[in-house]
UniProtKB/Swiss-Prot annotation:
Taxonomic lineage from the root: Bacteria, Bacillati, Bacillota, Bacilli, Lactobacillales
UniProt note: domains: The beta-hairpin motif is involved in DNA binding.
Superkingdom field: Bacteria
Residue ranges of every copy of the Helicase ATP-binding domain listed in the record: 31-188
Subunit: Forms a heterotetramer with UvrA during the search for lesions. Interacts with UvrC in an incision complex.
Xref: SMART domains: DEXDc, HELICc
Entry keyword NAD: no
Organism of this sequence: Streptococcus pneumoniae serotype 19F (strain G54)
A Pfam family the protein falls into: Helicase_C
Family per similarity comment: Belongs to the UvrB family.
Entry protein name: UvrABC system protein B
Start and end residues of each UVR domain: 626-661
Limits of the Helicase C-terminal domain: 435-601
Length: 662
């Protein structure tokens, strides 16, 4: 367990008060956590304010909390919401820092070795460091993470023991401080001052922590004693104030002291000799030569620099772990008594289960053909049972909890009442005979009322044919297929909300960001064809797409009623009955959600010279494209500053498209 420096309380800031069945959900969750219950489920219907309930629980139980989402986009949305709810506490973001990642791999059939290739997002790397350092410094920490949090990260003990602690009056020579900084992978650069670097000017050492992006620290010496420490703006050097204590955390999460490094190198050398003997005995001379050359180079780098590319593949030796022992992960940076909340648990727990096997098969190929030592197999994500061993207390959050969650606990807390009074939609089943003409009539009725329609099909061909037919019938319709990129998808949803078109056809309309209050009709074709999108959970999630409009209605087109359909219909009717009773008792009239239509900082197409005028980037000349790139760069920076990394990545991709034309 890591000792914390400060013991702060969570302070929730919100203009809202718990309403509907939020108060009882919050009370039950808190009572169960304080009573020591290990696992429970918050089964919250779409639009009932689950994130607000989670925030209330965190503020009341006052435990460091890890919130896990199943992708970066959802993690980013949750991070933004928790930042708003807890402005005075440490809300951190921990996802994969790769913008692009091609893992190291070998394809024996074509004798192709694919070297690891990646592009690291500096902003996300900073936030990862901010998360781990916050966990060592304070206890009022919420970390919102993707499943990246179950991947190997390096020893938290080594990380904590390597912290360079400075305060005015401390007796330490300037050169000793410089050596200490180099030992924790800081780089000296007196000209290009960036995160993870330091510079020296006489008796002044300026240090730019890995967890900061604007502020650095100026350490001033008087002889062999620190005279004072000041926080400064990294760019301008402007002094922001003096500090009494400064903790400099390592610039990398994989850090080892000199003594441990010598032991690790000796173990790597011994394993190399052992594996070379195995290859030679099997007559694999090419593999033996390859492994010897690669590993000896890495050993030399570790001895001289304390680091090498792919250092994580030696993490078992550097951490002092036994073969097969789980790696250290973000979870090990938390104290023992921490809380885990799994958002959209029916998706996220499946991901946690699947990570290990995919990683293992790729690495086994590298080991068998002499690209890596067998110990590289222990640089891996956690198995699900290893993840479970880290769990002290956990809350699974989902509108449709999976079988796994239901096996873990019988404690299910429902949150069905929406603060807006909105009801789950009415669901009806209609025969497939004449379904297209029937649906056309329903669409026209919605168009007259300025409402939108979602249609979900099972095949790409059906979606395309349906779209073509409705276009011929004069309907403004679009088809959203799986090849559409995030930015384009956001544009389509925005255009649907604005009324540029009225009907959206798709196969999977359960992706994030497809909550549209203007949608009053959801049509499910082939509802009786069992499968992932037509099982009970898939149907309930799809039905939920019509739950943000007071006129919400769902039509399932099917010739038989499957068990999945019946269970989904029954569950929706049960929730609707509870919601109606609550509204009647409290005199609430359901109101369609009023949600602002946010234009992605006006860059979802191309920046136009005149407002509301779209421009084809192919029609721009070289100078105009240059100006467009400048505007996009500025907007990308603005997005980063407000921590909207998904948007920043979208703008970056667009910028690359424009640059590619030159």
């Amino acid at each position: 367990m890591i000792n914390h420096i400060t013991d702060n309380q969570f302070k929730l800031v919100s203009k809202y008060q718990p309403s509907g069945d939020q108060p009882q959900a919050i009370e039950q969750l808190v009572d169960n956590i304080e009573g020591g219950e290990k696992a429970q489920i918050l089964m919250g219907a779409t639009g009932t304010g689950k994130t607000y309930t989670m925030s209330q629980v965190i503020s009341k139980v006052n435990k460091p909390t890890l919130v896990i989402a199943h992708n970066k986009t959802l993690a980013g949305q949750l991070y933004g919401e928790f930042k708003e709810f807890f402005p005075e506490n440490a809300v951190e973001y921990f996802v994969s820092y790769y913008d692009y990642y091609q893992p190291e791999a070998y394809v024996p059939s074509s004798d192709t070795y694919i070297e690891k290739d990646s592009s690291v997002n500096d902003e996300i790397d900073k936030l990862r460091h901010s998360a781990t350092s916050a966990l060592l410094e304070r206890n009022d920490v919420i970390v919102v993470a993707s499943v990246s949090c179950i991947y190997g990260l390096g020893s938290p003990k080594e990380y904590a023991d390597s912290v360079v602690s400075l305060r005015p009056g401390l007796e330490i020579s300037r050169d000793k401080l410089l050596n200490d900084l180099v030992d924790i992978q800081f780089e000296r650069n007196d000209i290009d001052f960036q995160r993870g670097r330091f510079r020296v000017r006489g008796d002044v050492v300026e240090i730019f922590p890995a967890s900061r992006d604007e502020h650095a620290f100026r350490v001033e010496f008087f002889g062999d004693e620190i005279d004072r420490i000041r926080e400064v703006e990294a760019l301008t050097g402007q002094v922001l104030g003096e500090v009494d204590h400064l903790a400099i955390f390592p610039a990398t999460h994989f850090v080892t002291n000199d003594d441990h490094m010598e032991v690790a190198v000796a173990k790597i050398q011994a394993e190399l000799e052992e594996q070379l003997a195995v290859f030679e005995k099997e007559g694999k001379l090419l593999e033996a030569q390859r492994l010897k050359q690669r590993t000896e180079y890495d050993i030399e780098m570790l001895r001289e620099m304390g680091y090498t590319n792919g250092v994580e593949n030696y993490s078992r030796h550097m951490d002092g772990r036994s073969e097969g022992e789980p790696p250290y992960t973000l979870l090990d940076f938390f104290p023992d008594d921490f809380l885990i909340m799994i958002d959209e648990s029916h998706m996220t727990m499946g991901q946690i289960k699947g990570m290990y096997n995919g990683d293992r098969s790729r690495k086994e190929m590298l080991v068998n053909y002499g690209f890596r030592l067998p110990s590289a197999l222990d640089n891996r994500p956690l198995r699900r049972e290893e993840f479970e061993s880290h769990v002290h207390q956990i809350v699974y959050v989902s509108a449709t909890p999976g079988d796994y969650e239901n096996e873990q606990t019988e404690t299910v807390i429902e949150q069905i009442i929406r603060p807006t009074g909105l009801l789950d939609p009415e669901v009806e089943v209609r025969p497939t005979m004449g379904q297209i003409d029937d649906l056309l009539g329903e669409i026209n009725a919605r168009v007259e009322k300025n409402e939108r329609t979602f249609i979900t099909t099972l095949t790409k061909k059906m979606a395309e044919d349906l779209t073509d037919y409705f276009k011929e019938m004069g309907i403004k319709v679009k088809y959203m297929h799986s090849d559409i990129k995030t930015l384009e998808r956001t544009e389509i949803i925005r255009d649907l909300r604005l009324g540029v078109f009225d009907v959206l056809v798709g196969i999977n309309l359960l992706r994030e960001g497809i909550d549209v209050p203007e949608v009053s009709l959801v049509a499910i074709l082939d509802a009786d064809k069992e499968g992932f999108l037509r099982n009970e959970r898939g149907l309930i999630q799809t039905i939920g797409r019509a739950a943000r409009n007071s006129e919400g209605h769902v039509i399932m087109y099917a010739d038989t009623v499957t068990q999945s359909m019946q269970r989904a219909i029954d569950e929706t009717a049960r929730r609707r009955k509870i919601q109606m009773a609550y509204n009647e008792e409290h005199g609430i009239v359901p109101q369609t959600i009023k949600k602002e239509i946010r234009d992605l900082i006006a860059v979802t197409k191309a920046v136009a010279k005149e407002e509301d005028k779209e421009v084809d980037i192919n029609s721009l000349n070289k100078q105009e494209r240059k100006e467009l790139v400048k505007k996009l760069e500025k907007q990308m920076q603005e997005a980063v500053e407000v921590l909207d990394f998904e948007l920043a990545a979208q703008i970056r991709d667009m910028m690359l498209e424009v640059k590619a034309l030159d």
